[in-house]
UniProtKB/Swiss-Prot annotation:
Biological process terms in GO annotation: division septum assembly; FtsZ-dependent cytokinesis
Protein name: Cell division protein ZipA
Bridged cysteine pairs (disulfide): none
Family label: Belongs to the ZipA family.
Gene3D superfamilies to which the protein is assigned, alphabetical: ZipA, C-terminal FtsZ-binding domain
InterPro entries linked to this entry: Cell_div_ZipA, ZipA_FtsZ-bd_C, ZipA_FtsZ-bd_C_sf
Coarse class of the protein's main subcellular location: membrane
Role of this protein: Essential cell division protein that stabilizes the FtsZ protofilaments by cross-linking them and that serves as a cytoplasmic membrane anchor for the Z ring. Also required for the recruitment to the septal ring of downstream cell division proteins.
Segments for region (Disordered): 78-120, 138-160
Amino acid sequence: MKDLQLVLFVLGAIAIIAVLVHGFWSIRKQQPKSMKQSPMAGFYKDQAKRRDSEGFDADGIGQVRVRKPGEVEETVIKPVLKTNLSQKPHSGTTKLTDTPLQDSLRQPGPHKTEPEHVEPKVVQPAQQSLFVGDDVKPAPTASTSMNTPKKIFNPSTSTAKLESYTGKPVAARPEPIKPPIQPAAPKVDVKAEVEEVKAEVEVKSTLKADAPVNEPVEPTDVLVLHIFAKAGEQIQGAELLPSLLSLNFKFGDMDIFHRHIDNAGTGKVLFSLANMLKPGIFDPDNMEQFVTQGVVLFMTLPGYGDPLMNFTIMLNSAYQIAEDLGAELLDGQRQPWSDATKKDYLRRLNAA
């Protein structure tokens, strides 16, 4: 048993040593080689030692030299190949001339003369001279033309002279068209117009004052419809408000809802809706907490527009509200709505 433990201990030590050796070897293998160990190190050293005849290496860097004060550097003069660029290359074919070759070589080159300074002369066209003078004269130079006064162009005389020179009729030049003289606008008497306007305004104001003023007529009758919650139930404000808005009711005067002639909530009031419980008002900001036993719709007679049409709208609105809230429609006496009640309301409408 002890021999087995010793063998295992030796094998384990050998395995650990092998792993360590392999690790060091792999780490050393992965490290980059330095320039000294690179196979190209000798080549770079030889290239650095090589220099040309002037003492410069492959990169154009010379040796470091120390100069003494007063020492003059010797300049190296390189031979330069000079060529005569003025000579033209000889062509492949040569021309035979009567003069011998030596004479042609002895002849001096063409003498270069400086160009003479020529004064520019300004020459006027011949056609222009026909319009200016009677006879055709030579064009003056620039110096004389600056001093001589210019003649004014006369279309009548120049046209006749042009016909005499050319022998052909020349079309007459169109004369400039003068704009028609507009008659002066008559002066407007502003004061008179202002007085006339004032007089018209005064007449209209007097007519309005004489016209009878439509005083508000006192109502002679009121048509009432009740919407009452069923037994054991209440009308919730959160359900009532959307129904009223869908029927174009608008919250307004006396803190109640009104139905106007315009669906946008403007114009005359056709009928109104109030709370059945006192004080009969609504709070639109707290409609979610609002509860009531019922609401009442009422329309005064006489009213604006056709009373029969207005009552029809009110009756249809009452039917819709009762259907939306699951409530009952009652008449003014809080009795169920019936055909007899409807006939009675129509009679009251006709009497109004």
